Amino acid sequence: MTRLDVEKTIEELTLGEKVALTAGIDFWHTASVPRLNIPTLRMSDGPNGVRGTRFFNGVPAACFPCATALGATWDTELLHECGRLMGEESIAKGSHIILGPTINTQRSPLGGRGFESFAEDGVLSGNLAGYMSKGIQEKGVAATLKHFVCNDQEHERLAVDSIVTMRAMREIYLMPFQLAMRICPTACVMTAYNKVNGTHVSENKQIITDILRKEWGWDGLVMSDWFGTYSTSEAINAGLDLEMPGKTRWRSTPLAHAVSSNKVAEFVMDERVRNVLNLVNFVEPLGIPENCPEKALNRPQDQALLRRAAAESIVLMKNDDNILPLKKDKPILVIGPNAKIAAYCGGGSASLDPYYTVTPFEGVSAKSTGAVTFSQGVYSHKQLPELGPLMKSADGKKGFSFRVYKEPVSAPSRELVDELHLVSSSGFLMDYVHPKIDSLTFYVDMEGYFTPEEDGVYDFGVTVVGTGKLLIDGETVVDNTKNQRPGSAFFGTATVEEQGSKELKAGQTYKVVLEFGTAPTSDLDTRGVVVFGPGGFRFGASRRVSQEELIAKAADAAAQAEQVVIFAGLTSEWETEGHDRDHMDLPPGSDEMIQRVLAANPNTAVVIQSGTPVTMPWAAQTKALVQAWFGGNECGNGIADVLYGDVNPAGKLPLSFPVRLQDNPSYLNFRSERGRVLYGEDVYVGYRYYEKVNLAPLFPFGHGLSYTTFERSDLTLATVPEKPQYETAGEPITASVTVTNTGPVAGAEVVQLWVRPPPTGVNRPVRELKGFAKVMLNPGEQKRVDIVVEKKLATSWWDEQREMWASEKGQYEVQVTGTGADVLTSSFAVEKTRFWLGL
């Protein structure tokens, strides 16, 4: 790559070349202009790892804990380290741009992508995103803050109009972007799919140009979310630099015509191109060649960081009678549906093929010197477990053959075009290409052999974006080719899982074939969703079992066990892009299993894996409760490190956990109705609502216990004189507090600084988080901790009449909290009311 003289290059570009530069050429690459040494740039998802350019059969990658897990660390230094590793992973994948971090706001526990964002609070989310972005960009890779803005649900996400007051927009939904930009102005921003107050964000000039560029002074590149461009002139004029992905729908001939007819001014077109070329120069020092082959890193130091991140994210919710940590030398019974699966990430564009995974059962087994036994308790799959890993191909390898044809199986003769060997029986073909395939319509035969270990009736399931028929020894068991019903898989583009059953004998080998036709062969109504490329497939199987027998067996075993731990929760099937959850409950049977095991052995520890809150009707019954999130590659080891006390838990909740869904402030207005969703809770999102109405959640924002105890003392505030002649002056307030580890083991404390406003001209939250710091202390050690906040940011609310921030005169209370219920207080004064704009 050669550094460009941007202005000279713009002068030399033809209109056609300028137009081409403002849209992608495929799913992951921008356009090039070889005659002017403008290269193609590669980008990759995403929020919790760098997948590379292929959803289907791609190169494995490091999988970080999900964003809510990283949010629970409250650790900016850790996020900075994770960002640097993400940058290195991006370079290994030949990618110049990472499509992350995600910093939307969890209005509701039900949001399908809630696990992708850090927190319900903008100060926590914005600071963590800023330091992660800083780490990414220190490696020369461009970070992308997304989704700008109010992309907080999946239901009708391409069309829904988010109706939100400008005050809530500023104080809640734009705040994480604003604070992240103060720490690290990212090279890119991705617009949201949705409308805001009547206009799609990708063509919303107020949001893209007036706020992001002019008010905040940001000068990077704005790209659309994938297929999230809805116009030609409107989007260009609003400030959307790059339409993704290619091939373009809106920019090509229509854009050239818009420029020639003055619907888009030439200087506006040049500004869009200028931002593309500036991005080229930003990543030029990387020296990544065009179409660079992808490779894996998976270094020991990376594995250690991922393990530390997984452990630091874990929140100890309850620990009555010091049930935890467990004893390594005592036998342990492991129960539950999440024990022997690795719930390492949520679903959708954040998902990837990890280098490896560690299940909780594997993590516990590696730690324990006592006997480790297992009882299933209940299954919690939403769809039947993948069959592929249990199959063997004709040559005896784990998995099955994947044979591609242009013609259907009914054709009298057909030519084999491509053959692959796969293990996973879930494949999203959006980026599958072959030189002999010149159409989205083609056919695949997937063939392998399955030998069951037990006699019984086996259920088989097929989910497709396309058509699929599953045959066992030539007999059709599942036919998902006609009368298809819409489901939630593959970003909401797939059918529901159609099932069939067959009685099988242990030890007997059966030939399994899935006859698959790509998306154009389907008659499924996909209006309102984007069908990516040729479609996708998933087939699974499971022996039919009695849930009652499984639960009874687990409870009986627990009654006899000295140490018991339950692993339950959600997976990427339940929390995924393209589909919001219908409720907060655990999968069917999980609550009953937990309650009956707790009744049999009250000292059972319960570990929940989920990206967002779940209902816990048994919470009062359990003595030890751990929130373990989706923990990335090292999830099982990170959990075991905490359960056995090798790591002292220090995580704090980044989300409020309500007792029930009805308690959440967005309960009445979360889904789209007639194309709109009203953000009726206004600024009262998460803890702001629960504290305002004095409604206790099950576990509050910021909650988290430790194996040690801490004391906070000697709070002092240092301020500087105000400068009333400067409306935007950000006078610092430094809160200093002594933190002492008063317990028996080393541990980390998160010090939280809150500001409580005086009575002002509008109704305001009881208090708001304005700063935080994390400190590591040995037993008996004490340290002085400083938290610095800007007075204007700590005190301001958005005045809709003036269309400015208002920092009102008055006395403001500072509260400092952490582990435990103790609150230190002090105060400071705003001497003169000020109104301001800016970053």
From Swiss-Prot:
Principal localisation: secreted
EC number: 3.2.1.21
GO cellular component terms, A-Z: extracellular region
Pathway the protein acts in: Glycan metabolism; cellulose degradation
Keywords: Carbohydrate metabolism, Cellulose degradation, Glycoprotein, Glycosidase, Hydrolase, Polysaccharide degradation, Secreted
Record: glycosylation sites: 197
Compartment(s): Secreted
Catalytic machinery residues: 225
Pfam families in alphabetical order: Fn3-like, Glyco_hydro_3, Glyco_hydro_3_C, PA14
Listed GO biological process terms: cellulose catabolic process
SMART domains recorded: Fn3_like, PA14
Disulphide-bonded residues: none
Catalytic reaction annotation: Hydrolysis of terminal, non-reducing beta-D-glucosyl residues with release of beta-D-glucose
InterPro entries membership: Cellulose_deg_GH3, Fn3-like, Glyco_hydro_3_AS, Glyco_hydro_3_C, Glyco_hydro_3_C_sf, Glyco_hydro_3_N, Glyco_hydro_3_N_sf, Glycoside_hydrolase_SF
Enzyme class: hydrolase
Gene3D superfamilies per record: Galactose-binding domain-like (2.60.120.260), Glycoside hydrolase family 3 C-terminal domain (3.40.50.1700), Glycoside hydrolase, family 3, N-terminal domain (3.20.20.300), Immunoglobulins (2.60.40.10)
Domain PA14: 395-555
One Gene Ontology term of the molecular function aspect: beta-glucosidase activity
PANTHER family cross-referenced by the UniProt entry: BETA-GLUCOSIDASE, BETA-GLUCOSIDASE-RELATED
Family according to the record: Belongs to the glycosyl hydrolase 3 family.
Role: Beta-glucosidases are one of a number of cellulolytic enzymes involved in the degradation of cellulosic biomass. Catalyzes the last step releasing glucose from the inhibitory cellobiose.
Name this polypeptide is given: Probable beta-glucosidase I
Gene of this entry: bglI
